[in-house]
Structure formats: C-alpha cells, structure tokens
Amino acid sequence: MAELTAIRGLAFDLDGTLIHSAPGLAAAIDQALVAQSLPAAGESRVATWIGNGADVMVERALRWAGVEPTAARVQETRERFDSYYAQTVDSGSTLFLQVKETLAQLAQQGVPMAVVTNKPTPFVAPLLAGLGIGDYFSLIIGGDDVIVKKPHPAPLYLVLGKLGLRASELLFVGDSRNDIQAAQAAGCRSVGMTYGYNYGEAIELSQPDVVLDRFADILPLIGHSSSHNQEPLV
C-alpha cells in the first residue's frame, strides 16, 4: 500500500465510518413514523437515508411514506425523532471493527484528530464518550455547528483553521459521497471506507484518493506502524 505523505491530521465522519448507527436511527425514525399512523421503514431502508443530517433523513422518510414534507410536517417529525433517538442512540450504536484500537494508536503517536458529522450536535459528544472514544478527538464538529453541512467544505475549513493545518495536510476519512465531495472541495485528500452506508452506492464511484476495507489500514497509509495485528473486517 502506497503511503500518503505529509499528512499531519485526520478528520473522520461518524455514522457509517466510526460507528454502526443505523439500528438506533432506524428505531427512532420508525417510531416517529408509526406515531403519525405511517408505516415503519425498517433498518435496511433507513440506512440508505443516512448522511445528510436529521432533517434530510426525516424528509426522505416522509416522502417514502407518501407524505408531502412540508416545513411544518418535517418539524413535527423531527421533534418526534429527536425524542425517540435520545432513547435509542446508545443501545443502537456500536463501533465498527478496529476503530477504537486504531484511534488509540493514532492518539498515542500524537496525531491530531477531529470528528466531522452532519449528525445533530447534541447527540455527538455523549455518543463518542459512551463508546469510549471521545477523548481521542481534539475537535468535534456536529451538524449544528456550521451554517452549511457536508458535502459543503465549510466543516473541513473549520477543522483546518482550528488545527492549524493546510488542506494538503489533512486526511478526511468517510463512507459516503458527501464526505468525499467535501474533502475534494476543501482540497483535502480522502479515504473512502467500503463498509458504510453511502445510500447503497459503492464508495469507489465518488473517486476518493484511497479506498479501504479495513479501518486499521489507515495506520500504514499515513506512515504509522500498528502495534499489534488486528483481525480483518468480515
């Protein structure tokens, strides 16, 4: 595997990259739909709606259920979703394989790291803490922390400014076209993980700089050694 040179910092998407969050999100969306006498969508379908933030996910759910997503209906459904998600976020979220171990090694080796997600900000830090990885990040940017979300480059510009990095020095790791497009627009290099959601599309179609199946392969990619062997993704 060829190394990416001159990388001094890493930023990570959250849902579909660091955590498998579809179960918790789907449970909350389905409860919000059923509470309005609408059909439940199910986890496999909801997983294809993840990536653009809660409002867009709610809009997609309403359209799928045959309901016009007016501003009032979206707000009502979003409020229901937020209430239900507060109950399902912890039990319905797990780390993907190799994530915690790899982040720990990167932190030990002094690599500054950020999370950049479109997820509503109030859920992000508690979720990271609950999964035992919150302390690895010097910067956390949620969907409510910027005026425009990914795929706009604004969140990555904020990372560059806060971490004092040039665009060429930041590597953004994500699982969806929004992540890759944001990195490309910001002038950063990108890694596309194959195991995420990405609206049911292959991440290769978005042309990231590197495509990886295993999270731990980030270490040799940026010239860092792994302290122990890790199991491959299955």
UniProtKB/Swiss-Prot annotation:
GO cellular component, one term: cytosol
BP GO annotations: carbohydrate metabolic process; DNA repair; glycolate biosynthetic process
UniProt entry tagged with the keyword Metal-binding: yes
InterPro entries, alphabetized: HAD-like_hydrolase_sf, HAD-like_sf, HAD-SF_hydro_IA, HAD_2, HAD_sf, PGP-like_dom2, PGPase_prok
EC number: 3.1.3.18
Taxonomy, superkingdom: Bacteria
Keywords noted in UniProt: Carbohydrate metabolism, Chloride, Hydrolase, Magnesium, Metal-binding
Catalyzed reaction equations: 2-phosphoglycolate + H2O = glycolate + phosphate
Catalytic-site annotation from UniProt: D13
Residues where Mg(2+) binds: D13, D15, D175
Cofactors named for this entry: Mg(2+); chloride
Pfam families per the UniProt record, alphabetical: HAD_2
Membrane-spanning ranges: none
MF terms (GO), sorted A to Z: metal ion binding; phosphoglycolate phosphatase activity
Keyword Hydrolase carried by entry: yes
Annotated pathway: Organic acid metabolism; glycolate biosynthesis; glycolate from 2-phosphoglycolate: step 1/1
Summary of the function given for this chain in its UniProt record: Specifically catalyzes the dephosphorylation of 2-phosphoglycolate. Is involved in the dissimilation of the intracellular 2-phosphoglycolate formed during the DNA repair of 3'-phosphoglycolate ends, a major class of DNA lesions induced by oxidative stress.
Subunit structure: Monomer.
Protein name as annotated: Phosphoglycolate phosphatase
Organism: Pectobacterium atrosepticum (strain SCRI 1043 / ATCC BAA-672)
